[in-house]
From Swiss-Prot:
Protein name according to UniProt: Succinyl-diaminopimelate desuccinylase
GO MF entry, a single one: succinyl-diaminopimelate desuccinylase activity
Lineage, uppermost ranks: Bacteria, Pseudomonadati, Pseudomonadota, Gammaproteobacteria, Enterobacterales
Cofactor: Zn(2+); Co(2+)
One GO term (biological process): diaminopimelate biosynthetic process
Amino acid sequence: MTCPVIELAQQLIRQPSISPDDKGCQDIMIAHLQTIGFTIERMPFGDTNNFWAYRGIGPTLAFAGHTDVVPAGDESQWEYPPFEPTIRNGMLYGRGAADMKGSLAAMIVAAERFVAAHPNHNGRLAFLITSDEEAKATHGTVKVVEALMSRNERLDYCLIGEPSSQHRLGDMVKNGRRGSLTANLTVHGIQGHVAYPHLADNPIHRVLPALQTLVNTHWDEGNEFFPATSMQIANIHAGTGSHNVIPGNVQVQFNFRFSTELTDSQIREQVETILKNHNLNYTIEWILAGQPFLTAKGELVNAVIQSIDQYCGYQPELSTSGGTSDGRFIAQMGAQVVELGPLNSTIHKVNESVSAADLQQLSRIYQRVMEQLIQ
């Protein structure tokens, strides 16, 4: 007997949807949702396909995810072709199996089963799907959220299918994420010959003490939900490539992953104070990739915990660890946001895979969340 979750996951994996190219994945999902009475609104922006689908009225529970995947890399290194889904020893192999086409299949089948059992359900069940999460994330969820907010759409709960599990299905869910703020700093000096330093001004020498101060700064203590804010230097570039030329400029890129104890404005102000105290001639560009967000225990978190406990026999750890996700955009709508998906140990790797049994169980967990919140 075949499993609809696995069949749909395989169908999605067969589409080589390298970000931001959807390659027809959303058409497959939409066909399933239309069959059970969902209203579909396609929302393309730029090079990205998105859709918003909903059924029912009232408090809204949305399932969110992305159809795009990262490139497979050297396909000769794969045990099985990355876009030919293969099941071996209970594992489903293929690019996107864990991140996150397996979750998408589990969501769709959960919705089909939920609607079949509760055709006149209370509340509204919705899907927010994009093909621009793995790359630039500029024409995907962020644009859909902007459009929905502009017309005062209501979103109460959102479950994102990102692969959150660590060692066994459902052992960890993300109920928040740190903010991400990047600085592109250029320190200006005067180019010259290394033999005549008095006729030049070496920007590398000037910036190093300031960077050391930034590295040594204790930004905050964190709190019960978030670790302390982290600042990391990512890139430094200067010089002409010649050993005898003092460079005229040095570019430094550094990133903050920050907790709810700080705002991005406070970080910017503190950084610029340090730079000015070191008498640097500089320009700086700031890129805010996302604000920190947190969903404390409440209806959605409680429903997810209970559903995992029912099907797995244990309760998950709530965590805000890891990088950013599209949850940072959805949280702007005032929704409670939680991320729950399969194990993440093989995501973006050669031989990406997920347990077929886990996907089937994940679909049941998703369905149980629906039943608790909008039945």
